[in-house]
Every structure is written in structure tokens, then in C-alpha cells.
């Protein structure tokens, strides 16, 4: 069972387009999202992992996680859930 609400799930144009064009990236992005839903914060730094855990417990802050593909450095994505849990976005760091 999910530990927090995600609101509307959206992806930026860059992530969406690459998911449509590349099955490998599509799998990576979906796998990252499943980890995110389990509170597996991927390649996020330790201080942000602690902040994410607190945000899940208290429901009062945004949640941000980082996922890096080991063989494709350009496939680094961020997943961000807004503090009010209204939306969750998959994006490339360059799209922030």
C-alpha cells in the first residue's frame, strides 16, 4: 500500500517523449516510479532521503527523489511530489 498521495501524475515533455521513443528508458522510468511509491529514494543524497521520510510521515513538505541509470548517465530523472500532494512530476534535472 502507498504511504503517501501522489496527486496527478505528469511527466515533462522531455521525459514523456523519450518514454514513447525508447522502450529501455520507458522501463527505467516506470521502475523508478515504482521504487518511489515504495519510498525507495534511489540515488538521492542522504539528507534528502531523511527529509523525504519526514515529509511522508508528516505530510508537510515536498518529496524529491533522484534515479540514475547505471549505463546511461543522460537518463537521470527526478521525481517530485508537491508539498500539498496535488501532483507528482517525472522530469530531467535540466527541465527543473
Where are these regions (language model features)?
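Short, compact, well-ordered microdomains
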Residues: 57-96
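Compact soluble domain cores
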Residues: 1-65
Amino acid at each position: 500500500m502507498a504511504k503517501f498521495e501522489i496527486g496527478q501524475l505528469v511527466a515533462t515533455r522531455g521525459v514523456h517523449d523519450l518514454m514513447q521513443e525508447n522502450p529501455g528508458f520507458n522501463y527505467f522510468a516506470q521502475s523508478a516510479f515504482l521504487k518511489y511509491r515504495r519510498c525507495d529514494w534511489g540515488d538521492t543524497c542522504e539528507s534528502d532521503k531523511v527529509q523525504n521520510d519526514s515529509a511522508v510521515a508528516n505530510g508537510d513538505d515536498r518529496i524529491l527523489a533522484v534515479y540514475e541509470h547505471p549505463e546511461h548517465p543522460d537518463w537521470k530523472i527526478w521525481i517530485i511530489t508537491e508539498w500539498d500532494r496535488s501532483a507528482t512530476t517525472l522530469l530531467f534535472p535540466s527541465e527543473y
